[in-house]
Amino acid sequence: MKRVRKLTRGDTFSLEVEITENGEYQTVDKMFLTVKENYSADEVLFQKKIGDGIELKDNKYLISIYPEDTNDFEYKQYVYDIEIIKGNIKKTLEVGILRICDEVTFAVDEV
């Protein structure tokens, strides 16, 4: 079963990823959160990577989605995955649905 994450369009959203092996915290060389319209789409709608939306803090990777990432999205479901690379090992940690939900206060209303 795929994980469903709900996000109000134009809001800030964060998620934490903890990587452990035998109870020990691990770091990775690369991490990506990639969002597309559907699984067969070539176009990446937005992507986060270490140093650009993903930070290591207190042994956890914090992935941040900012308002500008989803301001122009339609209210519907998109797909995402979280992938890590460490040395020559590549692993997808999570594949899921990003459901963009209705908003009432639009950016132009924030005066």
Q: How would you describe each model-predicted region?
A:
Residues M1-V111:
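Contiguous segments within soluble domain cores/interaction surfaces
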